[in-house]
């Protein structure tokens, strides 16, 4: 296969979430041509919000982003008053007693709201919105790939990268069917909500590292602090359907919690939108990369439950490795097939290991008899190594019809 140079190499990125945008920023910084497509109609049009941790991948992110983008990282932090290299211990607290169970150490890092991180990474990136991928075609010459969208438009490139999240359409093409690419359900009822108490004393009483989402008016105005709250429990049937029904159930369950958690949930304003998050995963496995012309990155490659703070870190790690592989292709030191196959050889087992670990950790964190043996207690925030035991392949598969119904 002919090796493209920097002038004719063209990377097609499907998905303008955080991972796709970081990849676009890194390609732009490297002088490699790209186009990025997003099926949503605009940036951050969804009302749902959540926060994510960046820790062991922070140095990789610094290398990937242009200096002027990384310089603003502290400004998008959930708590901009805390330096990136401050470090500390992430508290794990027994909800019913209020006692500290453990402190998970981290040397550097931060938490970021999804919307702010996405906005930071979108600056200077020309995202083509409203582009819903329906087909991927490969030229007979084996020199390119074509993305086909539902509005009738097409885009040609050297390689197509699926950065389109847990329910990736690109993964369906890579695996050859929607069934093989389908995520599995994690059987938990997981709620999350964005809360402003509009009361300084209430906000101060629940000032915790893991719950602050943003401080719009700074640390001296707690009445404006925005909190990201979540409550989850195993529940298969009788799930509340409306925001208010979910809030009523949360308030009821909160009565068994110790302070300040009990009041923090009881005080949630009546008009709060309590979202239900469909927690799912896909155990990473090899796919057909079509001579290096099709691959996956981030949540499209290894969607996992959010119970060890690893997801975004692996997305950033993927981007670092993938950029290095594309650079080799552009430099002429590796063919596209060689470079992408090497990228996948590192990423696939790493992703598979972490997905299995996060599933295991999710079960163990909801079982008092096992919680102290869970990966987050044994390993902390460090990336796993060699954790690939047990099987989660037998869980119920979430098919496209199920996804559409939620």
Residue ranges and their predicted role:
Residues 44, 136, 304-305:
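Short, solvent-exposed loop/turn segments at secondary-structure junctions
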């Amino acid at each position: 296969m002919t090796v493209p140079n920097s002038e004719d190499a063209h990377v097609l990125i499907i998905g303008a979430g955080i991972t796709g945008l970081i990849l676009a920023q890194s390609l732009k910084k490297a002088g490699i041509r790209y186009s990025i497509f997003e099926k949503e109609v605009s940036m951050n049009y969804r009302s749902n919000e959540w926060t994510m941790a960046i820790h062991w991948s922070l140095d990789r992110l610094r290398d990937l982003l242009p200096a002027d983008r990384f310089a603003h990282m502290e400004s998008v932090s959930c708590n901009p008053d805390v330096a990136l290299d401050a470090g500390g211990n992430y508290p794990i607290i027994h909800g019913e007693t209020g006692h500290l169970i453990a402190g998970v150490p981290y040397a550097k890092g931060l938490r970021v709201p999804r919307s702010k991180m996405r906005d930071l990474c979108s600056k200077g990136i020309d995202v083509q919105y409203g582009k819903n991928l329906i087909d991927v075609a490969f030229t007979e010459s084996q020199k390119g790939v074509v993305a086909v969208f539902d509005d009738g438009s097409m885009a040609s490139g050297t390689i197509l990268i699926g950065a389109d999240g847990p329910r990736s359409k690109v993964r369906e093409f890579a695996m050859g069917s929607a069934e093989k690419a389908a995520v599995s359900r994690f059987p938990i009822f997981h709620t999350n909500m964005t809360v402003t108490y509009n009361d300084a004393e209430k906000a101060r009483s629940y000032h915790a590292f893991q719950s602050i989402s943003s401080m719009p008016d700074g640390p001296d105005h707690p009445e404006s602090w925005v909190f990201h709250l979540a409550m989850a429990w195993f529940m298969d049937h009788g799930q509340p359907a409306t925001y208010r029904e979910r809030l009523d159930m949360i308030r009821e369950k909160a009565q068994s919690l110790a302070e300040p958690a009990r009041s923090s949930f009881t005080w949630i304003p009546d008009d709060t939108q309590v979202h239900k998050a469909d927690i799912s995963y896909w155990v990473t496995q090899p796919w057909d990369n079509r001579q290096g012309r099709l691959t996956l990155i981030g949540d499209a490659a290894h969607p996992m439950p959010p119970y060890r703070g690893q997801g975004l870190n692996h997305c950033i790690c993927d981007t670092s490795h993938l950029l290095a592989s594309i650079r080799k292709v552009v430099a002429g030191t590796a063919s596209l097939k060689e470079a992408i196959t090497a990228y996948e050889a590192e990423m696939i087992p790493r992703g598979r290991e972490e997905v299995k670990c996060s599933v295991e950790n999710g079960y163990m964190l909801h079982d008092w008899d096992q919680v102290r043996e869970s990966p987050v207690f044994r390993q902390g925030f460090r990336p796993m190594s060699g954790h690939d035991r047990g099987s989660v392949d037998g869980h119920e598969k979430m098919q496209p019809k199920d996804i559409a119904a939620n």
